[in-house]
């Protein structure tokens, strides 16, 4: 019985893949801090980060509308995403909470210090940055719901469930889910 379950999971349209990995650093203020956080994201992903601007001015925080106060990097492609997730999970000692997985196949977790990631060294000019990581898991045909022309719904049985996402992470990245 177990072999038929794995055969079903490996069948063409049932195969789970990584759609994208999004890494976010919320700096909270503009200027030099955003530049330093940008260097961190470039070291980790080898991509140029995209700045996120403040939606409104908040006097107590010292932010003004339109100022860049955060950075986001989106990585796509199976091999690049797997290599990046592996490095990020090593920083977490390959442990995750079951609450990190949602009902639609997304996984989110945080890192308190970027220097825990293998290959990243501490630079006193940059400092230490924490970040949020979100991973989207999907099956072939997931674009059907996102495309502009002839978009349609993806059935409930075709959406990646929480249990399937946990199994995928255990199998692909040897993660311990608590």
Show where each model-derived region lies.
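Ribosome-associated RNA-binding proteins
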Residues: 1-178
């Amino acid at each position: 019985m177990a072999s038929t379950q794995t055969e079903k999971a490996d069948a063409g349209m049932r195969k789970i893949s990584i759609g994208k990995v999004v890494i976010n650093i919320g700096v909270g203020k503009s200027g030099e801090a955003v530049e330093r956080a940008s260097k961190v994201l470039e070291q980790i992903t080898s991509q140029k980060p995209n700045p996120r601007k403040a939606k409104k001015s908040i006097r107590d925080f010292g932010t003004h509308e339109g100022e860049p106060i955060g950075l986001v990097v989106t990585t796509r492609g199976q091999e690049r995403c797997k290599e990046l997730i592996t490095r990020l999970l090593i920083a977490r000692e390959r442990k995750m909470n079951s609450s990190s997985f949602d009902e639609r196949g997304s996984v989110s977790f945080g890192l308190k210090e970027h220097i825990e990631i293998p290959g990243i060294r501490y630079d006193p000019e940059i400092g230490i940055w924490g970040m949020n990581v979100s991973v989207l898991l999907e099956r072939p045909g997931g674009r059907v719901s996102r495309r502009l022309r002839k978009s349609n719904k993806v059935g409930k049985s075709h959406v990646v469930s929480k249990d399937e996402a946990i199994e995928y992470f255990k199998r692909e990245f040897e993660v311990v889910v608590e």
